């Protein structure tokens, strides 16, 4: 392979070689386990207590004691190609004959709606609008990450999913940015690739749009090796939405504001780790702190890659737990290479062009290396922190499916409690933890055909969840995706949630169904 894989699922592979190796070593064999509860620790006690988001430096932890509940929930006797995880936390199986929402125009993956400060989803002039990462379909699907651009789609609002075309009825509107615009912010313009990664979009008075995204420059040699670390930055570009009888178009998006770069203090940077994660801005307002706009984003804890930085607090075992590990044991397993966190920032002006970092609100040190696309979701007075992670990015000794992980607390900065039996799992792909992972381009023979069926989930109002299709099928018969998956629905109640199998057809709603719930009015 001449060009190293970079990006979400691909970077996950590169960043977790030790984990992948341990899983591949067990390919074709089952993992012995005793009855659930006998070989696993108790989860860490979390209070859900809220702290001041700006005055406190409290950071919640998803501990190893918490994350080991994932394997405790898995059925050790589940046979080859079946799901070993509880159905209440498992996305229904997506059919392999899925339609393509772009009609073969572009690959589509991470997507997000047009929202306000409360995450309400807007239609404008009778049209629903979404933004997506897209790439030319002449590229191999796994080559898309370094060529990603932000595109947009639109469709008529107010049409029930059952009455739309099977592919969701979207029209591809094209790219948001003209060539060269998003590269303006980089002083060093000798980049080999300049790309755009995920973010969020907010609508304001007069139809002004502020598009928050991750602006990225790669500096590679012809053989694909890096001549210096890649440079991801959290950025924003303003534009304006227009509609007519034919659809949606935009003006603006000609200037990019360079807002945040990983600081090396709270958020790992390229000097500390050339493979660091820093991306996926999601902005919102908090009713408990009126007049403030906050942002959550994906980061890594600011330590030098490979430093033995796991702590007792990261492990989180209760005193005297017979299944507890020691810090030395965890370091010997190589878990210090997985150091994910979720960052927080606050806007310094009303234009939302200037921000400053606050301490992270959540860490997964020695548990996983990626907590992607974080978002704050509010319901019944509770604050839910949702994020996504790959099976391949979990640290040695931790295992769980690809999908959505959730945590609940009483404020933005809380002692977040992992949902669902203390595990954090909210919506996983059907997966068999008794067998190796494989890769989206080469599934393990024994894995469930849905192990890679969906990723990059976004939780919408009413508990609806959208995602994109990666790979569906078995090693001897699989199909790659590059389009949006069926929408599913979660029933969320306190620290628990479950998949609503009465929604749609056996729990699967329409493909690419991202409905608006609010009509924009100037």
Describe these PLM feature segments.
Residues 1-14:
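Bacterial Sec-dependent N-terminal signal peptides
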Residues 8, 16, 26-28:
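Low-complexity intrinsically disordered segments
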Residues 13-23:
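Classical Sec-dependent N-terminal signal peptides that target proteins to the secretory pathway
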Residues 22-38:
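C-terminal region of N-terminal signal peptides and the immediate post-cleavage residues
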Residues 37-522:
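Carbohydrate-active catalytic/glycan-binding domains of CAZyme proteins
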């Amino acid at each position: 392979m001449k060009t190293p894989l970079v990006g979400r699922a691909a970077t996950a592979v590169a960043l977790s070689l030790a984990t992948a190796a341990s899983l591949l070593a067990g390919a074709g064999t089952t993992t012995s386990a005793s009855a659930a509860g006998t070989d696993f620790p108790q989860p860490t006690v979390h209070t859900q207590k809220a702290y001041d988001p700006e005055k406190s430096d409290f950071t919640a932890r998803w501990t190893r004691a918490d994350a080991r509940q994932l394997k405790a929930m898995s059925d050790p006797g589940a046979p080859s190609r079946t799901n070993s995880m509880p159905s209440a936390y498992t996305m229904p199986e997506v059919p392999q004959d899925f339609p393509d929402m772009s009609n073969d125009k572009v690959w589509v993956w991470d997507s997000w709606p047009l929202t306000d400060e409360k995450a309400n989803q807007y239609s404008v002039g009778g049209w629903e609008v979404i933004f997506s990462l897209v790439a030319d379909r002449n590229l191999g699907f796994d080559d898309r990450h370094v060529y990603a651009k932000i595109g947009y789609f639109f469709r008529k609002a107010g049409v029930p999913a059952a009455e739309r075309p099977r592919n969701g009825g979207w029209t591809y509107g094209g790219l948001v940015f003209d060539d060269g615009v998003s590269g303006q912010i980089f002083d060093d313009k000798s980049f080999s690739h300049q790309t755009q990664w995920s973010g969020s979009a907010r609508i304001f008075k007069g139809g002004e749009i502020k598009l928050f995204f991750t602006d990225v420059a790669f500096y590679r040699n012809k053989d694909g090796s890096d001549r210096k670390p890649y440079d991801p930055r959290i950025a924003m570009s303003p534009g304006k939405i227009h509609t007519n009888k034919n659809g949606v178009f935009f003006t603006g998006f000609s200037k990019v504001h360079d807002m945040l770069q990983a600081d090396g203090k709270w958020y790992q940077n390229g000097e500390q780790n050339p493979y660091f994660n820093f991306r996926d801005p999601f902005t919102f307002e908090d009713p408990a702190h009126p007049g403030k706009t906050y942002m959550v984003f994906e980061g890594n804890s600011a330590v030098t890659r490979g430093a033995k930085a796991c702590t007792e607090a990261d492990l989180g075992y209760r005193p005297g737990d017979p299944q507890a590990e020691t810090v030395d044991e965890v370091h010997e397993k190589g878990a210090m290479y997985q150091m994910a966190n979720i960052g927080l920032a606050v806007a310094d002006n009303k234009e939302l062009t200037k921000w400053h970092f606050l301490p992270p609100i959540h860490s997964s040190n020695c548990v996983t290396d990626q907590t992607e696309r974080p978002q704050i979701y509010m319901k019944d007075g509770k604050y839910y922190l949702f994020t996504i992670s790959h099976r391949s990015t979990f640290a040695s000794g931790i295992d769980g499916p690809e999908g959505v992980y959730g945590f609940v607390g009483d404020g933005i900065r809380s002692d977040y409690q992992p949902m669902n039996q203390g595990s954090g799992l909210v919506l996983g792909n059907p997966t068999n933890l008794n067998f190796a992972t494989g890769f989206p381009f080469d599934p393990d023979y024994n894995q469930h055909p849905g192990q890679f069926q969906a990723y990059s989930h976004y939780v919408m109002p009413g508990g609806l969840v959208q995602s994109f299709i990666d790979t569906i099928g078995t090693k001897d018969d699989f199909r790659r995706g590059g389009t949006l998956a069926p929408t599913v629905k979660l029933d969320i109640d306190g620290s628990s949630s479950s998949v609503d199998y009465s929604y749609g057809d056996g729990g699967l709603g329409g493909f690419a169904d991202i409905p608006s719930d609010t009509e924009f009015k100037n």
